[in-house]
Regions:
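Hydrophobic alpha-helical
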Residues: 98-115, 182, 200-261
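Short, solvent-exposed amphipathic alpha-helices that sit
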Residues: 49-64, 147-151, 173-192, 209, ...
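Structural motif
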Residues: 69-93, 196-217, 231-233
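Flexible loop/hinge segments that line or gate small-molecule binding clefts
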Residues: 104-146, 253-263, 267-268, 317
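Hinge/cleft segment of the Venus flytrap/periplasmic-binding protein
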Residues: 12, 30-34, 170, 277-325
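C-terminal motif of bacterial Sec signal peptides marking the signal peptidase cleavage site
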Residues: 18-21
């Protein structure tokens, strides 16, 4: 299993350690006597365990490099607050800026402002399309649409005929793209898909909403959640109402509780985009750009998706509990 992962992600390891191309023009010059400060702003909600792992990756990289990293995110999925955070960060004139961009229209003005001030930018996790408008060093994440296709392929193997899709962040372009890919493949195979939005901050409400939906839609035999904030309360619900495990539950991303659910048979698979890498790699790449003007040859560095299921869940359980997977 270890050899399999090394082979799959070797290109990313090489990109971190080797000079791969000349950089684009930038007016900033590196002063070796000046402490490097990188600012990172993501849309990760305070209650979302996915982003605690991503921030761990960024912080680990900054410690190993001996540079300063400042990480922040809104309490909730709030693009107004996030844009204000980005504007405030720009005013501090950081050496580099790392951003997730889940809503391009809402964040465009702030990102353009950073670019005009010659602050180097790396985008992670969401919003790779912004590279068509703004000079971005690279994007670190996965193709969400392709990940949706992959989720559908795995779900079809379970023989499902009617699927419920749970969206915990309405307006997040990444989740929309996941759903689009998922829905496309299932529709082509005559599988119906219905989407229900939830309030990620209220797990109890999520459970009751899904309970009511399943009660009135008894043909549903599959559920896909677009992230752990949807999956965790539904796992607990299905343990109560579906002990025979007739409803096949799958999710994007994972936490220790998701891994436990896979090992217990309550979750059939999780799609892994390696958020630790999405935090770690941008800090390394930004530091290389600031100090040595290195940039990746490829505009997108893909960290996923891969499948975590009963066959390999044990391999990542301890790492997930440690906060690095």
């Amino acid at each position: 299993m270890i050899k399999k992962y090394i082979a799959k992600w070797l290109p990313l390891i090489i990109l971190v350690s080797i000079i791969v191309s000349c950089s684009k023009n930038n007016n900033q010059k590196y002063n070796p006597d000046k402490e490097i400060t990188i600012k990172m702003v993501t849309h990760g909600q305070a209650t979302d365990p996915f982003w605690s792992v991503g921030s761990n990756g960024a912080k680990d990289a900054s410690r190993k490099l001996g540079i300063t990293l400042r990480y922040q995110s809104p309490q909730n999925f709030d693009m107004v607050t996030m844009s204000q955070m980005i504007d405030a960060v720009i005013a501090t004139k950081p050496d580099g800026l790392i951003l997730s961009v889940p809503d391009i229209p809402a964040l465009r003005k702030s990102i353009v402002s950073a670019s005009k001030k010659n602050i180097p930018i790396i985008v992670i996790n969401a919003g790779s399309e912004i590279m068509e408008e703004v000079d971005i060093l690279t994007y670190v994440g996965q193709s969400e649409y392709e990940a949706g296709l992959k989720a559908a392929e795995e779900m079809l193997k379970q023989g499902v005929k009617s699927v419920l899709c749970i969206n915990h962040e309405i307006g997040n372009i990444s989740l929309d793209q996941r759903e689009q890919g998922f829905r496309k493949t299932l529709s082509e195979n005559s599988v119906s898909v219905k989407t229900v939005p939830i309030d990620a901050s209220d797990p109890s409400e999520t459970r009751e909403m899904v309970r009511a939906f399943l009660s009135s839609n008894k043909k549903v035999d599959g559920i896909l959640t677009l992230g752990p904030l949807g999956a965790i309360p539904i796992v607990r619900l299905l343990k109560d109402i579906d002990p025979q495990k007739n409803i096949k539950l799958a999710t994007f991303d994972f936490t220790p509780e998701i891994i436990d659910g896979i090992m217990e048979g309550h979750i059939i698979f999780a799609l892994d985009q390696q958020q630790y890498l999405q935090g770690y790699l941008p800090v390394v790449l930004m530091n290389l750009y600031i100090t040595n003007k290195n940039t990746p040859a490829y505009k997108k560095l893909e960290t996923g998706p891969s499948i975590i299921n009963i066959e390999n869940a044990q391999d990542v359980l301890a790492l997930s509990k440690k906060g690095s997977r």
